[in-house]
Amino acid sequence: LPDITLVSPVFTGDAGEQGSGGAGVTASPDIASFPSAPLSPHPPAFLAASRAHHADVGGMSPGSMPLSTELYQEGIIIPPLKLVDGGRRNDAVWELILRNVRTPWERDGDLAAQLAAHATGAARLAEIAGRYGLDETLRQARALLAYAESLTRAAIARIPDGIYRFEDALDDDGQGDSRRPDVPVPIRVAVDVRGEALTVDFAGTAPAVAGNLNAVPAIVESAVVYCLRCVALALLGELPMNQGVFAPLTVRIPRGSVLDPRPPHAVAAGNVETAQRVVDVVFGALAAALPDLIPAASQGTMNNLTFGGNRGQVPGSREDGMTHDPVSSPLAPDPWLLAPSFAYYETIGGGAGAGPAGDGASGVHVHMSNTRNTPVEALEYSYPIRVEAYALRHGSGGRGRHTGGDGLLRAIRFLSPATATITTERRRRGPYGLAGGEAGAPGRNALLRGSEVVPLPGKATLALEPGDIIWLETPGGGGWGEPG
């Protein structure tokens, strides 16, 4: 939380919190909290920080991944403030957050877990400093930074010098209207390799869009570093992750572009969708420099599905509609906290791109997703839904000497009224192939209502009735090499 000092000093044991795509973190659901560790009072030598994605922080649709057009629609905006003050939890701030979300008992527990993580991190740092002394601890920390920098420079030096360009696009501006013209949103990159230094320039990228696909610079830089680390791990076998990795790297992003919008542009999907396309263009550019290393494009989307509503009288639920006991909070036993609402957010895997070494993996999360499969049993136990189908989408991987991985089919039936939002990409153009390989199959979305099959665009918000089925087919990965 770089600007926490604009609010008040951070004292030992105090935690500041921030969650807002326009104020330093990636999107409103990604709440960051930064306490100081008790190692050195003025200023703190280390901070034990955490950032967690919360499944709902309010906003215009359950799951806080709406088809938004401005930041204010995406959930509560938390400026830098004290969540823990003088060693005590600030219950006024805590209550303000809980009253602005659909599932306050979940947020209560998740926020408490973040604070517990801080306490553990601070204790471990204090233990190290107590054992070795603060000066030696700082010396070793600086050595780790220098080691990561030297490895990063060594990896860059193994990439042939040159300027490598690539372009790909998002399907649309994120508004989700299938009647709108097919106007892709281009993302362009030039990767300039010079000795041990790397410059990644996104000049020529599209301006900020009306929808929520705008990404903040922190997202773009993280995606670039992810690509660089993948290359370094492949070339060198190791690369620790710390600020030293950034030292030989320069990232240039046009202000006002879809990769650096001005507030209050919407940014909810920048983290989950636009980041995937940033990875695709950076890898696409590096493929010209490292053709025997870089794979074809993976599915290029997280296939975000959020839904929520009120449980009501759902078979298997308790009389009050609750399936879980709320934890202790400043609101208990406030009826607001006990409201029988639910909100859920998941991402769905797809096909990985094939590469020079072999076929792509099928039915996996790729690149920036950072999530895992949700088990069907846990999902059906926790929410008023039934998973009707969950299978590989055979034949969706792009053909080539090596075939791209297959996407997935996931169909979910709703047992009670709900509001759902799908935020998906690669529905109009499939993931690219490389070295003559074919593109993977684009994804498809549909609503099944009775005997009717309603095709859906890549982005949509739906008012669902009991019995409705959301049907998602995720993209396959691109193929690599000329098909045999």
Give the residues covered by each predicted segment.
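Glycine/proline-enriched, intrinsically flexible loops and inter-domain linkers
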Residues: 1-14, 44-199, 203-312, 334-484
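Intrinsic disorder/low-complexity segments
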Residues: 14-43, 175-179, 310-339
